[in-house]
A protein has these predicted regions:
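An extended, acidic
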Residues: 15-139
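Residue-level detection of beta-strand-connecting loop/turn positions
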Residues: 9-11
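DPxDG-like acidic metal-binding loop motif
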Residues: 1-7
Length: 139
């Protein structure tokens, strides 16, 4: 970790400190029918207490986490977006957040990935538990 911080237009940015227990918490969950990982059951659970959206861009959602606009972003992709998640990992972690695969592991970004959890440190353990309990792999 470099630990020089994340910046937007020369202004330091930080992840927010919200939890998943209130509607102030904005969560992006990318979903599409052919994705390797089915996140619909996860959205159903998280949506009980947090406001969930699907904006259709994991890059924009990841930057939203880094800036504090989003509390959590979940990504079900495996191929072709590994370089996008690699960039988001650097930015979000420099802003004080966490990025792992959907199972809570570090991953390499020069090969297919196992999705991504992108969030602040306050929600990581709760998000990981919800994901692990409900994740389903599509064939």
């Amino acid at each position: 970790a470099v630990n020089n911080g994340a910046y937007q237009n020369d202004k330091r940015i930080f992840v927010n400190n919200y939890t998943l227990e209130n509607k102030e918490s904005l969560v992006n969950i990318d979903m599409w029918p052919a994705a390797k990982y089915n996140l619909y059951p996860i959205e159903e659970e998280i949506g009980k207490k947090s406001y969930t959206v699907t904006i259709g861009s994991i890059i924009r959602a990841g930057i939203g986490v880094a800036k504090g606009d989003f509390t959590l972003a979940l990504f079900p992709g495996t191929k072709d977006k590994n370089c996008d998640i690699a960039a988001i990992k650097i930015i979000v972690e420099e802003a004080g957040g966490i990025v792992t695969d959907l199972y809570g592991n570090e991953q390499r970004y020069d090969q297919p990935i196992k999705g991504a959890i992108i969030c602040n440190k306050n929600v990581y353990n709760k998000a990981l538990t919800i994901v692990k309990e409900r994740i389903k792999e599509n064939d």
